[in-house]
Swiss-Prot record:
Pfam families: Pox_int_trans. Acts with RNA polymerase to initiate transcription from intermediate gene promoters. Belongs to the poxviruses A23 family. The lineage of its organism: Viruses, Varidnaviria, Bamfordvirae, Nucleocytoviricota, Pokkesviricetes. Heterodimer of a 45 kDa and a 32 kDa subunit. The keyword Phosphoprotein does not apply. InterPro entries: Poxvirus_intermed-TF (IPR008789). Keywords: Activator, Transcription, Transcription regulation. The keyword Transcription regulation applies. This is Intermediate transcription factor 3 large subunit.
């Protein structure tokens, strides 16, 4: 980890990170983080009863548990704005909301109606304007006019699915769904699967998302703000997430080790100089501290922050290159999966930029109208 941050610091005058995803590999000695969090979230409907430690409340927006039988959101109401009457309601036509109408539940309903949550994304995805049922086309081919085509309503206690079809092309379906949602206090509950993955998610107020899988491996999607400047700010954001995450784990699984790690993490946060932060991170790696010793890069992107004032020559890019140009002038390096990958493509990017500058200078010095076609091909296509 310290080597990655050291290199990102070396190039931060030219490149800035955009997407940054990483994993914390599960450790048997830590315990069943997933199982204990699942138990706590499943049994409670008040945020304070899930997250006891009030010091970390401002950092956590909500927790989500999703498996085949249940999806449950526990929200921290204090992290949401007060809505006015003109605030846009996003999802009324997708959900039937049941609530006990208490003040707490009514506030949760208000938030749910206006937030673009994963439930809204899921129900929008499963509502399909047009879907071809190839099995029914096969019936038409082999069964003639007597083939049966389904249209109508299928429903259970929590999900109603309406299938409509055109009489002339009955194998083309329009599918619409409505989901029942129960809201009690800070909890938003629906039954059945509402996600591709079975995970626990912790959504931070800074938009970072932590996904915890069944084996307690974690996937962390680190958010990016416009005011993030250089590697030192990135380290502070990551370790701020660590600090609050580890205190949450200590709170829920009652393992004092996480409190100790949170204290070590806090030393990184309070250090003011980058060299000091990197030194502390290296020491954490040497002592096999959770969060550093089990850190593994998932994927990250870099963007070239300087302006490209010269002509861009796309022919210099390999077909499978991770160097991409967007809108003609924006250079990004995408899908980097290791420090070695990063060093390799930054080097290629630097060399390519120099070659483009040279070609651009030559191109600007010649008369395009009188120059030979072969010469122009050499400049533009090779």
């Amino acid at each position: 980890m310290d080597n990655l941050f050291t290199f990102l610091h070396e190039i931060e005058d030219r490149y800035a990170r955009t997407i940054f995803n990483f994993h914390l590999i599960s450790c048997d000695e830590i315990g069943d983080i997933y199982g204990l969090m699942k138990e706590r979230i499943s049994s409670e409907d008040m945020f304070d009863n899930v997250v006891y430690n009030k010091d970390i409340h401002p950092a956590i927006k909500k927790l989500v548990y999703c498996d085949i039988q249940l999806t449950k959101h526990i929200i921290n109401q204090n992290t949401y704005p007060v809505f006015n009457d003109s605030s846009q309601v996003k999802c009324c036509h997708y959900f039937d909301i049941n609530s006990d109408n208490s003040n707490i539940s009514s506030r949760t309903v208000e938030i749910f109606e206006r937030e673009k949550s994963s439930l809204v994304s899921y129900i929008k995805t499963t509502n399909k304007k047009r879907k071809v049922n190839y099995g029914e086309i096969k019936k038409t081919v082999h069964g003639g006019t007597n083939a049966n085509y389904f249209s109508g309503k299928k429903s259970d206690e929590y999900l109603s699915t309406t299938v409509r079809s055109n009489i002339n092309q009955p194998w083309i379906k329009t599918i619409s769904k409505r989901m029942r949602v129960d809201i009690i206090n800070h909890s938003i509950v629906t039954r059945g699967k509402s996600s591709i993955l079975q995970t626990i998610e912790i959504i931070f107020t800074n938009r970072t998302c932590v996904k915890i899988f069944k084996d307690s491996t974690m996937h962390i999607i680190l958010s990016k703000d416009n005011d993030e400047k250089g590697c030192i700010h990135m380290i502070d954001k990551l370790f701020y997430v660590y600090y609050n995450l580890f205190l949450l784990f200590e709170d829920i699984i009652q393992n004092e080790y996480f409190k100790e790690v949170a204290n070590v993490v806090n030393h990184v946060l309070t250090a003011t100089a980058l060299d000091e932060k990197l030194f502390l991170i290296k020491k954490m790696a040497e002592h096999d501290v959770y969060g550093v010793s089990n850190f593994k890069i998932g994927m990250f992107n870099l963007t070239f922050i300087k302006s490209l004032d010269h002509t861009v020559f796309p022919s210099l890019l390999d077909e499978d290159s991770k160097i991409k140009f967007f809108k003609g002038k924006k250079l990004n390096i995408v899908a980097l999966r290791s420090l070695e990958d990063c060093i390799n493509y930054v080097t290629k990017s630097e060399n390519m930029i120099e070659m483009m500058k040279e070609r651009s200078t030559i191109l600007n010095s010649i008369d395009i109208e009188t120059e030979s076609v072969d010469r122009l091909k050499d400049l533009l296509l090779k």
